[in-house]
Regions:
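Secondary-structure boundary/capping residues
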Residues: 28-31, 82, 145
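Glycine-centered flexibility sites
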Residues: 53, 59, 78-80, 85, ...
């Protein structure tokens, strides 16, 4: 239970690498309990999300992150924003702030359905020349990237990843352009 929770980050990554190799080489099935999703994604060939003593999703780490099966799993991972949208075709939705969003639905919804669309930080792309701009209300530097939190006219807060080598770094209160058309490969809706 939380075996690496009190270890310094640099040492923790080294221990994780060694632990993963030992477990793989010795072919030992192990259950590691953690609240650190990155740790679970790195160490686990499978991840289980248990909430309120109930297994909500059991899958490989990629699917748990990119294809969460419930709003509860989305909220637990806390990696994106659920926005209200309307299904306008078998491959598109409309949102009042983002406009048209295209992609491949993981499960079909009837045209006209009101849904909650999961927008992950990597789903939207920065474009200074875009006319779709939102206010930066927070900026977190993470070494290799920034995570900008954008506020839309309807007060949605949307996180967006931008590589840290990007020439124009935005400050809080600046406008931040989102590339159009918006295309999300795996459209996850509830």
């Amino acid at each position: 239970d939380e075996p690496l929770s009190n270890v310094d980050q640099s040492f923790k990554e080294e221990i994780q690498e060694k632990l993963k190799k030992i477990l793989k080489d010795s072919k030992i099935t192990t259950i590691i309990v953690t609240h650190d999703s990155y740790e679970a994604f790195y160490l686990g060939s499978k991840c289980g999300i248990i909430l309120n003593q109930e297994l909500k999703q059991y899958d490989d780490p990629y699917n748990v992150y990119h294809l969460p099966n419930s709003i509860e799993v989305v909220n637990f991972l806390n990696r994106g924003t659920l926005i209200t949208a309307e299904v306008t075709s078998p491959k598109s939705l409309e949102n009042e702030d983002l406009g048209t969003i295209t992609g491949n639905f993981l499960k079909p919804f009837p045209i006209g359905s009101k849904v909650k669309l999961l927008v992950q930080p990597e789903d939207l792309h920065h474009d200074d020349k875009s006319n779709l701009k939102f206010e930066v209300i927070d900026r977190k530097f993470r070494g290799t990237n920034f995570i900008y939190t954008l506020k839309t006219p309807s007060n949605m807060l949307i996180p967006v990843f931008v590589h840290s080598h990007h020439i124009h770094q935005h400050e809080v209160d600046e406008k931040f352009g989102i590339k159009r058309p918006i295309h999300i490969d795996h459209i996850v809706c509830f």
